UniProtKB/Swiss-Prot annotation:
The gene is jmj4. GO terms for biological process: chromatin remodeling; meiotic cell cycle. Signal peptide: none annotated. This is JmjC domain-containing protein 4. Pfam families: Cupin_8. Has a role in meiosis. The lineage of its organism: Eukaryota, Fungi, Dikarya, Ascomycota, Taphrinomycotina. It comes from the Eukaryota. Residues 140-433 form the JmjC domain. GO terms for molecular function: 2-oxoglutarate-dependent dioxygenase activity; histone demethylase activity; peptidyl-lysine 3-dioxygenase activity. Keywords: Meiosis, Nucleus.
Length: 473
């Protein structure tokens, strides 16, 4: 393991297989946390989540799905006719979900994902709750809110980051390319089939990543050099964390004023608040501290308008839809995001001995990059779910049941902020004050989402009042 790595989670040995949960009955969220989340161990879930949390199986019926979201207009991406890939600069076209399904039926090669949706852009006057409402469930996922819980009981006290929908069609299989993500993930297959090849984060340094690693945290989260604000082990940038701290202090000051506590105590917190605001402004805008002395209490939320750069997962589909074709390390395009490897789909499949790459020549450097790793293979069918901890590398091959008719592959993602206090189910994040503020804001956003969509949803628990959901079914 590299000196850059402090990873303490599960690392497979030869002969290991991904564990399978056949039944969630009698399994508590704490059981799941202790066995899998805390140990950073992927697990296949064969048992359905309780009806109160998950009715995604209804989306297997296309008529039902279209009745829910058919009229919603989204951006859909065509395959690049030159490279045969998705996500490499092709213009995305707006169309209704009904029109998208019809084009798939007619044989057009298109892909829909909400993971890098830009239609919910930041508008002047948006506060953080408004931004969270837009980002937690991008269109058309918000049209399906009556069918799933943003905070499923199984995930205990983890804070949700986003929910995503993926729809495509391919008889022979399309590939995501080998990459990692920055959040814990529950991947649910609605229709079609998915084959995952997964590799633990402790092999990151040998996988020819596009970016240069600065650190692999104990929970496996990978940070990169050259970022304006390097990621912390909980997935936040320093700017994110500083803003959250100002929000926590702002809320606490307001509460103390209502309680009429001594002014001296309030003044100490106000001084801390002002210092934190200065840090935020210097990271966000730059310039001398004295330029910002006129800011009033309550300005913290406004700092978020456009303050945070692109989501590191926003280019997740860079190679989605890639037909198998030889690509050497030297041929890899420089615009690959940091978290993608330069190992081609062919190289990985050749190393794994998959039939589609048996007769394909690949660069020896690709095979040597994979030597010493212990990839695990996960085959998922409709109804299956996979828990994958943050920064586990994975290549996903998606395929439909058949090429004719209306068969499509549909998947759904839950993303959660990665825990960095792994031994504490009740408080899975080390920076409690910051995550108390984040939980409160996420809870408000969830309330707004479900109020709009006519469903009641339990908020994620505050850090000082952890989740008391005891069973998953």
């Amino acid at each position: 393991m590299s000196e850059l790595s402090t990873y303490k989670g599960y690392s497979p040995k030869h002969g290991d297989k991904v564990p399978v949960l056949q039944n969630l009955n009698d399994l508590t969220p704490k059981d799941f946390y202790d066995k899998f989340i805390a140990t950073r161990t992927p697990v296949i879930i064969k048992s359905s989540l309780p009806e109160s949390d998950w009715k995604g199986y209804l989306w297997q019926q296309q008529d039902y799905l279209l009745s829910k979201i058919g009229d919603i207009v989204c951006k859909v991406e065509p395959i690049d006719p030159v490279s045969g890939t998705f996500g490499q600069g092709m213009s995305r076209n707006e169309m209704s979900i009904k029109e998208f399904f019809q084009k798939l039926k007619n044989g057009e090669r298109l892909y829909l994902t909400t993971q890098y949706d830009e239609s919910n852009e930041v508008l002047d006057g948006d506060d953080e709750v408004s931004l969270l409402v837009k980002s937690l469930c991008p269109h058309p996922t918000d049209g399906l809110l009556t069918d799933f819980s943003i905070t499923p009981a199984l995930m205990g006290n983890l804070v949700p980051q986003q929910c995503n929908l993926w729809i495509g069609k391919s008889e022979n299989g399309t590939s995501s390319g080998l990459h990692h993500d920055f959040h814990d993930n529950i991947y649910a297959v609605i229709s079609g089939y998915k084959r995952f090849v997964i590799i633990s984060p402790d092999h990151a340094n040998q996988l020819k990543l596009s970016g240069k690693i600065s650190k692999i945290h104990p929970n496996g989260l990978i940070s990169y050099e050259g970022e304006d604000c390097p990621q912390r082990s909980d997935g936040l940038t320093e700017l994110d964390a500083a803003i959250a701290k100002t929000q926590f202090l702002e809320k606490k000051i307001g509460s103390l004023k209502e309680l009429a506590v001594p002014q001296e105590s309030i003044e100490l917190l106000e001084a801390e608040y002002e210092n934190e605001m200065d840090r935020v402004l210097q990271m966000q805008i730059g310039g001398p501290e004295e330029d910002w002395n006129d800011l009033e209490e309550g300005d913290a939320a406004s700092l978020l308008d456009g303050s945070v750069g692109g989501d590191p997962e926003s280019d997740i589909l860079l190679n989605e839809g890639n037909d198998i074709e030889a690509t050497s390390l030297q041929d890899t395009k420089p615009e690959l995001p940091d978290h993608f490897t330069k190992v081609s789909v062919n190289g990985l499949h050749k190393f794994m001995g998959f039939d589609d790459a048996k007769n394909v020549d690949v660069d020896k450097d690709e095979l040597s990059a994979l030597a010493g790793t212990v990839p695990l293979v996960v085959d998922l069918e409709p109804g299956d779910m996979l828990y994958l901890p943050a920064s586990w590398f994975h290549e996903v091959t998606s395929s439909s049941a058949s090429s004719g008719g209306s068969d499509v592959h549909i998947a759904f993602n839950y993303w959660f902020h990665p825990p960095d206090n792994l031994e504490d189910f009740d408080h899975p994040y080390l920076d409690r004050n910051i995550w108390q503020a984040k939980r409160h804001l996420v809870g408000e956003a969830i309330d707004q989402l479900y109020a709009t969509n006519k469903k009641n949803e339990k908020r994620p628990a505050e850090d000082d009042s952890p989740s008391q959901k005891k069973t998953c079914q």
